[in-house]
């Protein structure tokens, strides 16, 4: 699919990326689109929550650790709390896999977040093929 044609390349998995920096978000989005991932970009916790409630096709959340209006862990705990409150057939929020992207490569921090339930902790610079492999593990 050519960019000039106006057509969108077919995608197979829809991911939400809650990002802190525009430049890295667009680079990651372009790389993921080449591998048939639709990466929805949002830049705040508030916007992420809105998208998650509205879009039932989102399969996984990628989230920068530090955001303009809070942290990835605040979003993670909010989503888990809301999902746990609804024990019904079609809850408003599903327990989506949650990945944290960060420059902090402290093993103790990674252990703490994984212990709390975060599915993956990826340090910068992001290795795109490795990220895709990890994402596919959770969405396929």
Where are the predicted features?
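Active-site residues of response regulator receiver
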Residues: 63-66, 102
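Alpha4 helix (beta4-alpha4-beta5 surface) of REC/receiver domains from two-component response regulators
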Residues: 73-74, 94, 102-120
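Non-catalytic signal-transmission and effector/linker regions of two-component phosphorelay proteins
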Residues: 1-31, 35, 46, 77, ...
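Residue-level signal for the "D+5" position in two-component response regulator receiver
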Residues: 41, 67-70
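A Lys-centered signature of the CheY-like receiver
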Residues: 123-125
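Negatively charged, flexible loop motifs adjacent to catalytic sites
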Residues: 47, 68, 104-108
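Acidic, metal-coordinating helix/loop segments flanking the phosphotransfer/catalytic sites
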Residues: 41-60
């Amino acid at each position: 699919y050519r960019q000039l044609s106006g057509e969108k390349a077919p995608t197979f998995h829809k991911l939400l990326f809650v990002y802190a920096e525009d430049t890295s978000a667009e680079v990651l989005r372009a790389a993921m689109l080449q591998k048939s991932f639709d990466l929805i970009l949002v830049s705040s916790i508030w916007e992420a929550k809105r998208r998650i409630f509205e879009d039932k096709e989102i399969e996984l959340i990628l989230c920068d650790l530090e955001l303009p209006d809070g942290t990835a862990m605040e979003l993670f705990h909010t989503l888990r709390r809301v999902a746990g409150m609804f024990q019904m057939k079609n809850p408003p929020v599903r327990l989506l896999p949650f990945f944290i992207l960060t420059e902090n490569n402290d093993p103790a921090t990674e252990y703490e977040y994984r212990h709390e339930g975060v599915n993956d902790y990826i340090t910068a610079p992001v290795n795109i093929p490795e990220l895709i492999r990890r994402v596919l593990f959770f969405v396929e």
